[in-house]
Amino acid sequence: MEDRIVRAISSDGMVQAAAIYSRNLTERARQIHKTLPVATAALGRALAGASMMGDALKGQGASLTLQIKGGGPLGTVLAVSDNEGNVRGYVTNPQVELPLRADGKLDVGGAVGHEGTLTVIKDLHMKEPYVGTIDLLGGEVAEDIAGYFVESEQIPTACGLGVLVDRDQSVKSAGGYLIQLMPGATEDTIVKVEGGIMAAGPVSALLEQDPDPEHLLRAVMSDFDLKILETQPVSYKCYCSRERVERALISLGRKELEEMIREQGGCQLSCQFCDTVYDFSKEDLERLLASL
C-alpha cells in the first residue's frame, strides 16, 4: 500500500484527527541513512509525526521542521515536512545500537535521550517563522509531540506513533495518529478518546495487520462517528539540487570561496537528507566567485 495521510473529524465537531501509513518513506530513509533498528524507529516516528503536522499547514510552500535533541547517543533527530506531508529527515548517529528494553521493544527513549528539547519551526512565508520549544517528556517522540501541542499551542492532543523493524532490519510497518480536541469538548469526549486508544493497542501492530490509515483511525476512535475529510499521498521527498548548493556556496562570500579554491582546489558536498553528492571543481568555484 502507498503511504498516505487520512484526515477526519467527529460528527459532533469536537474531535479532529489524522492518521498516517508511512512504511515506504521510513524504509527509504533507512536505506539512505543506513540506520540500525533503534535509529530507524526514532527517525520513522519523527517523520510520521512531522508529516501529519506539516500536512495541516495552510499556504503553498509552507514547511514544518521537527527537531529533537534529547542528549542521547542518537544525537539530533530532525524531520522536515512540506505542506502536503512529504518529508525528509536524518539522525546524527544512525549506527547507534542499544539493548532491547525489558519488554523486548526497541529503546527509542534511551537512544533519543530523556533530557533535552523538542522544537517545532513553522515557516509560513511570513516575516518570521513560528518557533515553539518544550522540554522533552520522555524521548519516545509521540508523547513529546502531544506535549508540544498542549504546551505551545494549548490544544489537548493524543499522539501514537510506531515503527516495526523486521528481522532483516527493513521496515515492516510504520505510521501513527494525531487526535486533537476542539474548543468545547467535554469530559465525556476525553474519556471516549482515551478509552478508544487503550482498547486499540500499539500502532505498529495495528498497521502490520492492516496498513490502511483510515482503519487505524476508526480503531482508535471506535466510539466516534467519523467523517473523512481528505486522503493525501505522501512520500520521502528531498528538495536539494545543484542550484541550491551553488546558492549556499555563494552565500559563504568571496573570502571563503577564495580560501576554498586556494587550499582545496575544489569541494565535495553531500545532502544531509538524501546523501546526494555534489562535486565542484576549481573551475566551478571560480565561476561562482566571478558571479559575486
Predicted regions and their residues:
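Cys/His-clustered metal-coordination modules, chiefly Zn-binding fingers
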Residues: 198-292
